[in-house]
Regions:
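Short, aromatic-rich amphipathic segments at membrane interfaces
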Residues: 167, 172, 194-221
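Alpha-helical transmembrane segments
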Residues: 226-240
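Acidic, S/T/G-rich, low-cysteine, solvent-exposed domains in lumenal/extracellular/periplasmic regions
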Residues: 1-195
Length: 243
């Protein structure tokens, strides 16, 4: 739901505006299914806006196998934000049903993407009536920024916006530890901690297989290995007959 405004008992949007004007820090996630015009107006002051539609990855190595909407984005290379300091960027972050974020150059604002789709990604706009996940005419082309940091240089206010509402659940942390460390890095940067102190893992890190890798492994185990076994067996039979 959106923030309430002046016609409500509590003017949440004015409170948020005052907080940011005083140099406040904001970490938020958003859903492609939710409309929040009050909040969007605040984010526009930082040059940030929603890109219409749900991002679908066209590069199978950048999404989970057979799930092109479950994105495995690339990390950005920020020079001002410290959100990725100490984050192990070799681990995957997974964003499912995500939306892009556009960045418009704005006076007195510095903004940097932290997570990006590949250039093969595209956006499906009519998400309530999808008939295919394949690219169609009219789909917006990537790459898309999926998480963005911005700072107002006058007030010191910072916004860190992630265009996915479900990356911060406990079950996902178990299978995608990169989500947890990314969020830890984001939170640490907003409270002035430049380097993320990694905690000792209590469980073995699960293996995440991208779509292209999974397909190659599937072909290997279904076709290549059985064929190799049959060929080897035929060779053994022929050698025995010659004896």
């Amino acid at each position: 739901t959106d923030f309430s405004a002046g016609d409500s008992l509590v003017d949440e949007i004015s409170q948020l505006q005052d907080y940011l004007a005083a140099g406040g820090k904001l970490l938020l996630t958003s859903s492609v299914y939710a409309q929040t015009p009050q909040l969007d107006a605040v984010l526009a002051q930082f040059g940030l806006a929603r890109a219409e539609g749900m991002v679908v990855e066209g590069d199978s190595s950048k999404a989970l196998y057979n799930s092109a909407w479950s994105l495995l984005p690339d990390y950005g290379t920020p020079t001002e934000s410290t959100a990725l300091n100490g984050v192990n960027t070799s681990t995957h972050v997974m964003l499912s049903v995500a939306q892009g974020i556009t960045v418009t150059e704005t006076e007195d604002v510095t903004a940097e993407p932290l997570l990006n789709s590949s250039s093969a990604a595209y956006a499906k706009v009519d998400i309530n009536d999808l008939t295919t996940m394949e690219r169609e005419d009219g789909n917006a082309d990537g790459p898309f920024a999926l998480a963005v940091w911005a700072r107002n240089e006058d007030t010191g206010a910072e916004v860190l916006w992630i265009g996915c509402p479900n990356m911060d659940n406990e079950q996902l942390y178990q299978s995608m530890p990169g989500n947890l460390t990314f969020l830890q890095g984001c939170a640490a940067s907003l409270v002035g901690q430049d380097v993320l102190v990694d905690t000792k893992a209590l469980e073995a890190e699960p293996i995440t297989v991208a779509g292209s890798t999974a397909a190659a492994l599937g072909l290997t185990f279904v076709f290549v290995l059985p064929a190799a076994v049959l060929i080897a067996g035929a060779v053994v039979v022929l050698l025995r007959r010659r004896r």
